[in-house]
UniProtKB/Swiss-Prot annotation:
Organism: Desulfitobacterium hafniense (strain Y51)
GO biological process: L-cysteine catabolic process to pyruvate
Protein name listed in UniProt: UPF0597 protein DSY1109
Pfam families associated with the record: SDH_alpha (PF03313)
Signal peptide from the UniProt entry: none
Coiled coil: none
Family assignment from sequence similarity: Belongs to the UPF0597 family.
A GO molecular-function descriptor: L-cysteine desulfhydrase activity
Length: 430
């Protein structure tokens, strides 16, 4: 079927892509802290002498072990806060610390050593919650980000509320409704979308994400998973697809100062959803238009799987993106609904349940595993093999399987998430 431009699904899917495929420089959780800190400092009108942060446990998990870019290798919540205060430009949003000069890098270190920055675990039921209070002389500013990385819900200065209604649900409802996402409609949209409607978005994704993957291959970042794959596994397209996605993560998790186009609020998911598809399109000589349509499939499938799980979870988000890239690769090979649906189910059955233990270099290895599952999921179906309803969390019907994955990630792994965070915090204190 052909989807017309005025169709409700067409406009919804296009809006979702525009909301989600945005640029971010640095791992998005520390960057969200830097963004909030920069905005709060602007409202305060001065560099604070004291800062108190109250953050949800998942923020601690995702900031603890990742390098904050443009800080000369600093890690952690305090470093992200200092970077935002000293060098942040809040109008750049998730590229808030993309432009930091050498003098500012030194000022960040000095500020960290001389300033009281206190971090507390927030007494909050919200998975994504950042509350920043800054003090300068007799003035203070409170700022809160909730639910997703750029959603400022409250700004208060000296007792006066200057922004926000206090309604934490308002930001989520302002996003385009994800309930309309389905595998069949995503494929229909990808077949029908006018290229001019998505070209600018996808050109940036191709350019930015390919650039950081090349940097990961050429530099010495993290555990160099991408380079190890190419050196030890060979140069087949299946290996290159995994290696490029892993190399992008190698670089990003270790502070590479290049932006990426994210997906579901995550750079790792944005790279995993796109780089394997880009690599396969080059190998197959698919052409520009086919690549764009395959990227529409991979990005929207990733978002569809991730929606039920939520922004942050104990369920590793790149698993969703690995399923997405597998779907995009199936599309490049001429696959339709059956091929894509079975690819997703097969891939999800293989790697669902890999835990998220925060942003750090080993994410690159998980990306390699997720992409491998996506490719294997497609190749299994091509060979007439599949996992069937009743095999573990696999249900009859792709949408039922996706719903099971969402339930597992959002509800089933809540206690797992708590124990992962307990382990990580105990490591910090020991």
């Amino acid at each position: 079927m052909f989807m017309e431009r005025q169709d409700r699904y067409y406009q919804t899917y296009l809006n979702i892509l525009k909301e989600e495929l945005v640029a971010a420089m640095g791992c998005t959780e520390p960057i969200a802290i830097a963004y909030g800190a920069a905005k709060a400092r602007e409202v305060l009108g001065a560099v604070p002498h004291k800062v108190v942060l109250e953050v949800s446990s998942n923020i601690i998990k995702n900031v603890k072990s990742v390098v904050v870019p443009n800080t000369d290798g600093l890690k952690g919540i305090e470093a992200a806060t200092a970077a935002g205060i000293i060098a942040g430009r809040s109008d750049k949003i998730l590229e808030v610390i993309a432009e930091v000069c050498q003098a500012e890098k030194q000022q960040i270190k000095t500020y960290l050593s001389e300033t009281d920055i206190e971090v507390k675990l927030a007494d909050s039921q919200i998975i994504f919650d950042i509350m920043i209070t800054m003090f300068h002389q007799d003035s203070y500013v409170k700022l809160r980000i909730a639910d997703y990385h750029t959603h400022i819900v409250h700004i208060e200065k000296n007792g006066e509320i200057i922004f926000g209604t206090g309604d934490l649900d308002a930001g989520i409802s302002s996003l385009t409704d994800r309930k309309l996402l389905s595998v069949s409609k995503i494929i229909e949209f990808a077949d029908s979308v006018r290229i001019e409607d998505v070209k600018e978005l996808l050109d940036k994704q191709i350019e930015y994400n390919s650039a950081i993957a090349r940097a990961g291959m050429e530099g010495n970042y993290g555990a160099n998973v991408g380079r190890v794959l190419l050196k030890t596994y060979g140069n087949d397209v299946k290996i290159r697809a995994k290696a490029m996605a892993a190399a992008g993560s190698d670089a990003r998790m270790s502070g590479c100062e290049l932006p990426v186009i994210i997906n579901s609020g995550s750079g790792n998911q944005g790279m995993t959803a796109s780089l394997p598809v880009i690599e396969y399109a080059a190998e197959l000589q698919s052409g520009e238009e086919k690549l764009y349509r395959a990227l529409v499939v991979s990005n929207l499938i990733t978002l569809h799987l991730k929606t039920g799980i939520g922004r942050l979870s104990a369920f590793c988000g790149v698993i969703c993106a690995g399923c997405g890239s597998g779907a995009g690769i199936a599309y490049l090979h001429g696959g339709g609904y059956d091929e894509i649906a079975h690819t997703i189910v097969n891939a999800a059955a293989i790697v669902s349940g890999i835990v998220c233990d925060g942003a750090k270099p080993s994410c690159a290895g998980k990306i390699a595993a997720a992409v491998d599952a996506g490719i294997l999921g497609y190749l299994m179906y091509k060979e007439g093999q599949q996992f069937r309803g009743g095999d573990g969390i696999v249900a009859k019907g792709i949408e039922n399987t996706i719903a099971n994955i969402g339930y597992l990630g959002k509800v089933g792994m809540k206690e797992t998430d708590k124990e992962i965070i307990n382990i990580m915090l105990n490591q910090c204190s020991s």
